Amino acid sequence: MKLMVSSVTKMSNRHQVREKAVKTIFQLIRPQVPVSLDQACAFALEAGNDPEAGFEGSDAYLDRLVQGVNQTAEELDQRISHYLAEDWTLDRLARIDLAILRVAFYELLYVSEDEVPSKVAVNEAVELAKTFSDDKSKQFINGVLAGLLKDLKN
């Protein structure tokens, strides 16, 4: 199902796509006001964009990430939980960190290594943490993803 968003920017690279995906997923995690997937995506796509730049339509990989993460969120959360320290739960994670982890786990588990090498998925997640979170979160996200990578290689 392609997202129906009337005003969406054309993504110029995968990093921008991942930023928009994380912003979309973030809005769907424990929202104070219920929001639909289309509303969250529209807001994420329009946030921070110059209206003069023009709008040309959604990126196929953005649609794939957002739809995929949304459809597999429960499984992704179970897998993420497996890599958290014993005294940590998903509810203790910052919403932005959970959004970054969901996108990264989705890429590592559901996107082929040929399309997105695991090293790229991890590096992108760490870069997103640098942008949207703090140094502790960056290290935490890197550690969680390192655990998943270790298991995927075995």
Go through each PLM region and give its residues.
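N-terminal interaction/assembly modules
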Residues: 1-131, 136-138, 142-154
